Swiss-Prot record:
<feature type="topological domain" description="Cytoplasmic">
    <location>
        <begin position="225"/>
        <end position="232"/>
    </location>
</feature>
<keyword id="KW-0472">Membrane</keyword>
<feature type="transmembrane region" description="Helical">
    <location>
        <begin position="418"/>
        <end position="438"/>
    </location>
</feature>
<dbReference type="InterPro" id="IPR002202">
    <property type="entry name" value="HMG_CoA_Rdtase"/>
</dbReference>
<dbReference type="GO" id="GO:0006696">
    <property type="term" value="P:ergosterol biosynthetic process"/>
</dbReference>
<dbReference type="InterPro" id="IPR009029">
    <property type="entry name" value="HMG_CoA_Rdtase_sub-bd_dom_sf"/>
</dbReference>
<feature type="active site" description="Charge relay system">
    <location>
        <position position="922"/>
    </location>
</feature>
<keyword id="KW-0597">Phosphoprotein</keyword>
<feature type="binding site">
    <location>
        <begin position="1022"/>
        <end position="1023"/>
    </location>
    <ligand>
        <name>NADP(+)</name>
    </ligand>
</feature>
<feature type="transmembrane region" description="Helical">
    <location>
        <begin position="321"/>
        <end position="341"/>
    </location>
</feature>
<feature type="topological domain" description="Cytoplasmic">
    <location>
        <begin position="280"/>
        <end position="320"/>
    </location>
</feature>
<feature type="topological domain" description="Lumenal">
    <location>
        <begin position="254"/>
        <end position="258"/>
    </location>
</feature>
<keyword id="KW-0325">Glycoprotein</keyword>
<feature type="modified residue" description="Phosphothreonine">
    <location>
        <position position="1028"/>
    </location>
</feature>
<keyword id="KW-0444">Lipid biosynthesis</keyword>
<feature type="transmembrane region" description="Helical">
    <location>
        <begin position="259"/>
        <end position="279"/>
    </location>
</feature>
<keyword id="KW-0521">NADP</keyword>
């Protein structure tokens, strides 16, 4: 399909459409020159541009006057200066001439058809009489036309042909067009519109007015839809541009078919054309494409995602356009007197083609740039979060490897495409230069079919004086002299219009030559030339953007040392039951590799910058001898994996047990470049955790698998059971009420008065605005929402509440807080303020605090589910009444008796921590993130369950999310990295998933407690043969029936 090509080769498609549109524009412009322009003519005349037209003084014109010869009964034509006329006399006749090849077999009557009713001399058939004269290889055809200098008839110009237009243009170039002329033209246009409207009936006005209103509503609706989809201007403009192109193509097709539609009729049809093409279809296509590209795997090529989205969106769009085209074609065929039906059908055909070609190509480039910008935003966020430039670039490229590659490849396609266009341009010019000797042959070919206007400068300069001397005008002057009803007429010889004979369409060179001539003619127009400059400027901007993408893509990480590859090939993971050890294998490999040099030799080589020549054992010696700092191995060796292996060996040999070097803690096959300057220091390996998955859990109508990294048996299974029960009721519904991360510095003042004044200023609108401006200037992503203050003696605690997009954002907030405090001290008059700490525990971070429970921190989410009573019995093995009673007694009363703050739940921290470890969140923040209150109610025999979590602190950028395993789990949830269209949506979605998962865990654990199955399930799922001593059969049976027997003796249980 065409959309696949447009998505894969967008730049080529745009270039091809641009060429075709330019050709259609030429045809459209040629058609406009044949239309009536009373408004334009009157506006030109108003400013003197057409004064005396066609008697406007033009170059090379001559004025002749018939005078009597003294003493003789005869008269002669004398040339007189134009100034002698003085505006009082008048010119009776204009002699207009056409020059064309002498042997061209054409019907020259077509040249003067517009002047059929104005000619002075007619032949027997009523057509204009020509006066012919051969001049070399050219034929001069002349006619006589009446003209009045004082009052040139405007109606004479309304049927203006290209001949008249060619004479208007020099006058316009000479006088210029000012702003006042444009205002006059607008005013004249408005007056002419009112005149046309006054001649129409009320029904016609109502129909056209309604159509224009609907058109404006459609355009505004399209703009608003594109705004909601994340495009402020360009996609909206592209849709309108595509529609304009379709109208141009349709007009060209209609005129080629012989159907003439006047300019006034086209203006009346414009709103119907806009309404016919259905702009909302373009918005729907855009929505589906953006949705597909937002939720798809970011590593898949962009053009594949767009092609799939277009394939899904195509059927309804094709049905709409097909129905409209068929109906309009039938009406056009039936010929009901409305010839615009043919135009409407043509517009719909071309609009459908351009929608899936030109617009899809524009949309592809837009999304390519958006994906690249998203990757660049990730890199900048990671830098603000404290990562180094190289690590941030590596992580951003790894998160979306296809973006840079695609943008880079797109740049190279642009580069080669530009070279091809430049080559074609040079070839056309060379062809133009080389074809000059053959133009005369082309113009005089016997196969010529019609005449076309030529550029006069390319042909011999025929001057009126020379033609007069050659007797070219003798016949026409004699005919004028013989007319009996005039005395002493004046005649003006106007400069001629040159025509060449067009060759037959079978000549390829003629076609190319004609195209070049037309192109050069129209390209010189001031309007088109300005658009070409704008297009070239836009092209340069796009090329610069893609050049930056290609440059970033060309930056490659330094390849790993060969010694690491050797070690990886030799060292394998060996189970603990094997008698061999990794240490023995490594020592054997080092011994085989080379002989260990003395410490003095190693120090000399190291000081001389030859560290790369040392083997691992020699580097270990240097490190043990304190010549290389343990933390600097990555920087010195330029090889992160080798540095980890050596550090592991050094630590093992320096420790008391000396077991680390030969332990089963893994070290190889891990991307430590993502860890360096990002997650951990002094790395000696990595710690695998069991990773399970619960679900799928339906959250807000979408299924999610919940990744959980934990070492606690029965936790994943319990959460899985809760997911099953929640899904039985239709899934979970979540509401996010707040999204704000906080940092609370502590500042001090000399006395309470100054501290109180600072608090009042910070709480005022002025103070809030100053601090917000200072804070927001430090980051492209962090935005200060509001400030809360608390005073304790002379110490002032300030809580900055900010939004941080998809990042958890603690580091970028700290940078903004520092700068805001500096501005407060230097510019707000609080130079006596002392900053005690950027974090004064008023945040509060990684500590239980009532302020997080009340005001929230991070994302505040409430999740709810309705579990049918039957599902409670069949899945959870308990009853609704028992669950509600247990929740009140345990989670509410029990936590209150313990004086808990935010701990009104069964085990929210269990689920939060497991999900945090799996998705790369900060595990320490489970302290405040686990704030949760679980509520249960019996509603018509069903269980209404909800969890409210006011301080879920999560992010999808930075921290542990840069690691590949954790990033893979974010990919599983579809929330990795920054959201393409709405920053912050990915982290907010992750918070919703956490809340829903906590609700599933709460439901399952409370059910196990209510039914007395907790101990039994843990014994069954939390005992493994590897770490549990053998038991006899009598000991394996849990004694949970004792609880049932106790409860059974209670009345009502």
């Amino acid at each position: 399909m065409i959309y696949k090509l447009a998505a894969r080769y967008p730049i080529q498609v745009i270039a091809i459409v641009g060429i075709l549109v330019s050709m259609a524009y030429f045809s459209f412009l040629e058609a406009l020159t044949q239309e009536d322009f009373p408004v334009l003519i009157r506006a030109l005349k108003r400013f003197g541009i057409l004064d005396g037209f066609p008697n406007t003084r033009l170059p090379n014109e001559m004025i002749l006057k018939l005078s009597s010869v003294q003493g003789e009964d005869a008269s002669v034509w004398e040339q007189i200066p134009a100034a002698e006329l003085g505006g009082e006399g008048f010119v009776d006749f204009d002699i207009t001439q056409w020059y064309y090849p002498a042997n061209a077999k054409v019907d020259v009557a077509q040249l003067v058809e517009p002047y059929r009713n104005d000619c002075i001399f007619h032949d027997a058939s009523g057509a204009c009489h020509f006066f012919f004269k051969e001049v070399g290889n050219w034929t001069v055809s002349s006619i006589a036309l009446p003209s009045n200098l004082a009052n040139p008839p405007i109606d004479y110009f309304l049927d203006s042909s290209s001949t008249v237009i060619q004479r208007i243009l020099p006058a316009i170039r000479e006088h210029g067009i000012s702003w006042s002329w444009l205002l006059q033209l607008i005013a004249r246009t408005w007056m002419n519109t009112l005149k046309i409207a006054s001649q129409a009936s009320k029904t016609e006005l109502l129909i056209v007015g309604t159509a224009y209103a609907c058109m404006l509503i459609s355009i505004v609706s399209l703009y608003l839809k594109m705004r909601r989809l994340g495009s402020k201007f360009w996609l909206f403009f592209s849709v309108l541009l595509s529609t304009l192109f379709s109208v141009q193509f349709a007009m060209t097709l209609v005129r080629a078919s012989g159907v003439r539609i006047s300019l006034v009729s086209l203006i009346e049809s414009l709103p119907f054309l806009i309404n016919v093409v259905a702009l909302d279809k373009a918005a729907e296509l855009t929505r589906q494409v953006i949705t597909r590209c937002s939720v798809s795997d970011s590593h898949s090529p962009m053009h594949e995602d767009i092609a799939k989205a277009c394939r899904n969106a195509a059927p309804p769009i094709l049905r709409h356009f097909s129905f409209g085209i068929v109906v309009l074609a039938i009406f056009s065929y039936c010929n009901f007197g409305i010839k615009q039906f043919f135009l409407f059908a043509a517009v719909m055909i071309y609009d459908l083609l351009l929608l899936f070609s030109f617009f899809v190509a524009i949309l592809t480039l837009k999304l390519e740039m958006r994906r690249y910008n998203a990757k660049d935003d990730v890199r900048k966020v990671l830098i603000e979060e404290g990562l180094s430039e190289s690590t941030a670039r590596h992580v951003a490229d790894g998160n979306d490897s296809s973006a840079t590659t695609s943008a880079g490849s797109r740049y190279f396609k642009v580069r080669y495409g530009t070279k091809i266009i430049l080559f074609i341009f040079i070839a056309f010019n060379l062809f133009e230069l080389c074809s000059i000797p053959f133009k005369h042959y082309a113009a005089t070919s016997a196969a010529a079919a019609r005449l076309i206007p030529l550029v006069r400068s390319q042909y011999p300069d025929f001057k009126s004086q020379r033609l007069l001397d050659d007797g070219v005008f003798d016949d026409v002057l004699s005919a004028i002299s013989s007319m009996s009803n005039i005395e002493s007429p004046s005649v003006r010889l106007l400069p001629a219009v040159f025509y060449g004979a067009e060759l037959s369409s079978t000549s390829f060179l003629s076609t190319i030559h004609s195209f070049i001539n037309n192109w050069s003619h129209y390209i010189s127009a001031s309007f088109l030339s300005k658009w070409i400059v704008c297009a070239l400027s836009l092209s340069i901007a796009v090329n610069v953007f893609l050049l930056n993408a290609a440059r970033l893509n060309s930056i490659k990480e330094e390849p790993e040392k060969k010694v690491v590859e050797k070690v990886v090939e030799v060292v394998k993971y060996i189970p603990s039951s094997n008698s061999s050890s990794i240490d023995d294998i490594q020592k054997d490999e080092i011994a085989q590799e080379s002989v260990v040099r003395s410490l003095e030799e190693c120090i000399t080589l190291y000081n001389n910058g030859q560290i790369s020549t040392l083997n691992d054992e020699e580097v270990v010696q240097l490190t043990l001898a304190k010549k290389i700092p343990l933390y600097a191995l990555e920087r010195v060796l330029k090889d992160v994996t080798r540095a980890v292996v050596i550090r592991r060996t050094v630590v093992s040999r320096s420790s008391r047990t000396k077991t680390l070097e030969s332990s089963n803690c893994p070290v190889y096959h891990y991307d430590y470049s993502r860890v360096l300057n990002a997650c951990c220091e002094n790395v000696i390996g990595y710690m695998p955790l069991p990773l399970g998955v619960a679900g799928p859990l339906i959250i807000d109508g979408k299924p999610f698998y919940i990744p959980m990294a934990t070492t606690e048996g029965a936790l994943v299974a319990s959460t899985m059971r809760g997911c099953k029960a929640i899904n039985a009721g239709g899934g979970a519904v979540t509401v996010l009420t707040r999204d704000q991360m906080s940092r609370g510095p502590c500042v001090a003042f000399p006395n309470l008065t100054r501290a109180g004044r600072a608090k009042i200023w910070l709480d005022s609108p002025e103070g809030q605005e100053v601090m917000k401006k200072a804070f927001n200037s430090t980051s492209r992503f962090a935005r200060l929402q509001h400030i809360k203050t608390a005073l304790a003696g002379t110490r002032l605690f300030i809580r900055f509440c900010t939004s941080t997009g998809d990042a958890m954002g603690m580091n970028m907030i700290s940078k903004g807080v520092e700068h805001a405090l500096v501005v407060m001290s230097n510019d707000a008059g609080f130079d006596d303020m002392q900053v005690i700490s950027v974090s004064g525990n008023y945040c509060t971070d990684k500590k239980p605090a009532a302020i997080n429970w009340i005001d929230g921190r991070g994302k505040s989410v409430i999740a709810e589910a309705i579990i049918p009573g039957d599902a409670v019995k069949s899945v959870l093995k308990t009853t609704v009444e028992d669950l509600v009673k247990l929740n009140v007694d345990k989670n509410l009363i029990g936590s209150a008796m313990a004086g808990s703050v935010g701990g009104f739940n069964a085990h929210a921290a269990n689920i939060v921590t497991a999900v945090y470890l799996a998705t790369g969140q900060d595990p320490a923040q489970n302290v405040e993130s686990s704030n949760c209150i679980t509520l249960m109610d019996n509603v018509d025999g069903n269980l209404q369950l909800s969890v409210s979590m006011p301080s879920i602190e999560v992010g999808t950028i930075g921290g542990g999310t840069v690691l590949e395993p954790q990033g893979a789990m974010l990919d599983l949830l579809g929330v990795r990295g920054a959201h393409m269209t709405s920053p912050g949506d990915n982290s907010r979605q992750l918070a919703r998933v956490v809340a829903a998962a906590v609700m599933a865990g709460e439901l399952s654990l409370c059910s196990a407690l209510a039914s007395g199955h907790l101990v039994k399930s843990h014994i069954g799922l939390n005992r493994s043969a590897l770490n549990t001593p053998a038991m006899d059969s009598s000991a394996k049976k849990p004694a949970t029936d004792a609880l049932k027997s106790v409860n059974s003796r209670v009345p009502g249980r």
